[in-house]
């Protein structure tokens, strides 16, 4: 068993790549270690293409094992279940990073599995998994010539931090992940505290220059340990077939792409596809030599060439816009009467109905990870039903990876403006229902989430808007597109989503399909995105600029009281008897803490006010010189104990009763008396006198 190792430094941390010791039956197997963190990444490449395959079946699975952190899983079975959302997001991040490095037309199935074997909690293992995925591919024999790498960058006190640990990330205004090759940026994912575009671009370029060290180490490992290159075929468009279709149908295809409506355009294009298939299969020019798949691929290639050339030649885009024009926007809030907050955001043929629901601390999401169980006060869920694109399909199933990814992007975009628990004690859940989609539904979700929260009275720091940018590039000619359509995303070279406030960027996601994206192009894309974002914010601000001062009448009410910590036991009572009684009588939820905080959560104001008054009565302090209506709770030989407030009793001597002209033998337990607090000694003992009738 021969083991090969490569060692390099990244951000003052030593990282070790090793192959040959584990999982040797996989085509590629690499362990990536940093301190006590170890990730095993395997790659398996199928040597033949599945019959009828017309896409690249790459799958990436990032898995965390609880034993890596010295823990036993929860649940009845005490074993790991399906991957968490965080694991799915890391799988997507790795997939998006490596997918562009494969040649077009390569359809062999590849499966990558990254397994966290050891974890010390100092930093997320996601970058180790990404580096390991690239290394295992490089030695697997797959056609993976453009080796990629990825790094995380933070930004604190005006300085970029390479490969920050978790403590550094907590203080950072930026969490940026960049992956790419030696000479190209391929993927960017980030969250930021409203940072200027110049800082975001600087972070991307700073990250890219540090990829070379990792790529060199992976290349060295591949040179000494790589398997022979597999034999494979590349699917290519039949040029003769493409020429045939173009000569007969190009004019009609061209006319179809002047129809601005997506539905009408698709009807025309589907009709053309049928006509093309009929023409090819009934013509005398060897039509039977071609499959339906080949014909439709050639047709699609003509569409792609047409859309791209039109844009590069300065002609109108598919829907008639120029490169910088934003589609018409319509904003409505409060569209659903029975919810806590709602907004309907429509941009062209993309529409998101976004609903905000307020809850108590008990509604917070509990997220289990290698770090333990964490509580999330802010949840955002994204649903993409098939009717949003005019299709039939599965409904009511678990969210797909794409839905989880879009929800996460929208959450990260609005996280920077979400209030902390001290300022806003509610738990918030946002649901985005995509009702129509023709590009950039995730950015519509960002805009709708901001509007919906303001409608619900959530005190967000600033409104947030998002926009998706695109790129068409051919040699030195290029065009940056604002607010891209679905077809422009599919046929273009870049998907660049930017969200932020009027002050700066809060989230960024970029996927680039080609090499050669210069700094000049990135600067233009950032500037166009900023202009577009401010335009969208302006329209949103015309409808609602700041959060509503109060929550909806149908929304729950929260009140927080800070009382003497010694009184908490009185609020709770023996075995929780007192607090249970308040809950049963008012219907409110009551949470207490040893610090003296009492949090009341009620379905309406009446319930809240009643619970509040009951708690206030329990925790109220008696004062000297004040008169109280009390009740005798115990009779002694020399006097009576009278309950004043909650659990506070005072002692009433018989001499005081007689002095007030009342006979002591007439007193019974449970009898009401009006008493005056004469004094309270240092021990807290209360002496009373009877108020004469």
UniProtKB/Swiss-Prot annotation:
Its EC number is 2.7.7.8. InterPro entries: ExoRNase_PH_dom1 (IPR001247), ExoRNase_PH_dom2 (IPR015847), ExoRNase_PH_dom2_sf (IPR036345), KH_dom (IPR004087), KH_dom_type_1 (IPR004088), KH_dom_type_1_sf (IPR036612), NA-bd_OB-fold (IPR012340), PNPase (IPR012162). It comes from the Bacteria. It is an enzyme of class 2 (transferase). PROSITE patterns: KH_TYPE_1, S1. Residues 625-693 form the S1 motif domain. It catalyses: RNA(n+1) + phosphate = RNA(n) + a ribonucleoside 5'-diphosphate. Mg(2+) binds at residues 489, 495. SUPFAM superfamilies: Eukaryotic type KH-domain (KH-domain type I), Nucleic acid-binding proteins, Polynucleotide phosphorylase/guanosine pentaphosphate synthase (PNPase/GPSI), domain 3, Ribonuclease PH domain 2-like, Ribosomal protein S5 domain 2-like. The keyword Nucleotide-binding does not apply. One of its GO terms (cellular component) is cytosol. The keyword Nucleus does not apply. Involved in mRNA degradation. Catalyzes the phosphorolysis of single-stranded polyribonucleotides processively in the 3'- to 5'-direction. This is Polyribonucleotide nucleotidyltransferase. It comes from Francisella philomiragia subsp. philomiragia (strain ATCC 25017 / CCUG 19701 / FSC 153 / O#319-036).
């Amino acid at each position: 068993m021969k083991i090969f190792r490569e060692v390099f430094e990244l951000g003052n941390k030593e990282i070790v790549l090793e192959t040959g010791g584990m999982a040797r039956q996989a085509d590629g197997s690499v362990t990536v270690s940093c301190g006590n963190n170890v990730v095993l990444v395997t790659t398996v490449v199928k040597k033949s293409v599945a019959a009828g395959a017309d896409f690249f079946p790459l799958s990436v699975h990032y898995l965390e094992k609880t034993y890596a952190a010295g823990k036993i899983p929860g649940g009845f079975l005490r074993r790991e279940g399906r991957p968490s959302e965080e694991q799915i997001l890391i799988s997507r991040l790795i997939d998006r990073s490596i997918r562009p490095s494969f040649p077009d037309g390569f359809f062999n199935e590849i499966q990558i599995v990254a397994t966290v074997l050891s974890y010390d909690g100092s930093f997320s293992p996601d970058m180790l998994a990404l580096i390991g995925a690239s290394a295992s591919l490089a030695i697997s024999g797959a056609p993976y010539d453009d080796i990629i790498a990825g790094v995380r960058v933070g930004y604190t006190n005006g300085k970029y931090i390479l490969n920050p640990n978790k403590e550094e990330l907590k203080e950072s205004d930026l969490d940026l992940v960049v992956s790419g090759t030696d000479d190209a940026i391929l993927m960017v994912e980030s969250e930021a505290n409203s940072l200027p575009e110049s800082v975001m671009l600087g972070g991307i370029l700073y990250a890219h220059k540090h990829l070379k060290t990792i790529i060199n180490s992976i290349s060295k490992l591949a040179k000494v340990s790589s398997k022979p290159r597999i034999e494979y075929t590349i699917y290519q468009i039949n040029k003769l077939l493409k020429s045939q279709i173009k000569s007969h149908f190009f004019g009609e295809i061209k006319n179809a792409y002047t129809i601005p409506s997506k539905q009408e355009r698709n009807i025309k294009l589907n009709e053309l596809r049928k006509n093309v298939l009929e023409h090819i299969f009934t013509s005398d020019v060897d039509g039977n030599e071609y499959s339906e798949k080949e014909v439709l691929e050639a047709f699609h290639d003509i569409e792609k060439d047409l859309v791209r050339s039109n844009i590069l030649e300065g002609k109108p885009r598919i829907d008639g816009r120029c490169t910088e024009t934003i589609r018409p926007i319509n904003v409505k809030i409060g569209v659903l009467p029975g919810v806590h907050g709602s907004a309907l955001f429509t941009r062209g043929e993309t529409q998101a109905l976004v609903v905000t629901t307020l809850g108590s601390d008990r509604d917070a999401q509990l997220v289990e990870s290698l770090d333990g169980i964490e509580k999330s006060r802010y949840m955002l869920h994204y649903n993409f039903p098939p009717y949003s694109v005019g299709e039939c399909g599965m409904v009511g199933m678990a969210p797909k990876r794409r839905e989880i990814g879009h929800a996460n992007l929208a959450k990260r975009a609005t996280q920077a403006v979400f209030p902390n628990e001290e300022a806003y004690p509610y738990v918030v859940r946002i649901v985005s229902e995509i009702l129509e989609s023709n590009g950039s539904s995730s950015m519509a979700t960002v805009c709708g989430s901001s509007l919906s929260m303001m409608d619900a009275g959530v005190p967000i720091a600033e409104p947030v808007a998002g926009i998706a940018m695109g790129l068409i590039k051919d040699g030195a000619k290029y065009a940056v597109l604002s607010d891209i359509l679905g077809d422009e995303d599919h046929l273009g070279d870049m998907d660049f989503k930017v969200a932020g406030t009027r002050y700066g960027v809060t989230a960024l996601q970029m996927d680039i399909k080609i090499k050669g994206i210069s700094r000049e192009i990135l600067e233009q894309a950032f500037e166009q995105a900023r202009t577009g974002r401010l335009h969208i914010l302006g329209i949103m601000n015309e409808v609602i600029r700041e959060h509503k001062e109060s929550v909806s009448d149908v929304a729950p009410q929260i009140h927080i009281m800070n009382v003497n910590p010694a009184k908490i036991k009185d609020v709770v009572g023996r075995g929780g008897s007192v607090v249970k009684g308040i809950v049963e009588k008012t219907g409110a939820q009551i949470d207490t803490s040893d610090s003296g905080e009492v949090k009341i959560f009620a379905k309406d104001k009446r319930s809240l006010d009643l619970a509040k008054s009951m708690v206030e009565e329990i925790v109220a302090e008696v004062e000297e010189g004040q008169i109280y209506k009390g009740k005798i709770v115990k009779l002694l030989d020399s006097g009576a104990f009278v309950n004043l407030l909650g659990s506070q009793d005072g002692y009433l001597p018989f001499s005081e009763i007689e002095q007030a002209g009342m006979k002591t033998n007439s007193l019974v337990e449970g009898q009401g008396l009006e008493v005056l607090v004469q004094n309270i000694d240092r021990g807290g003992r209360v002496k009373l006198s009877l108020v004469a009738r």
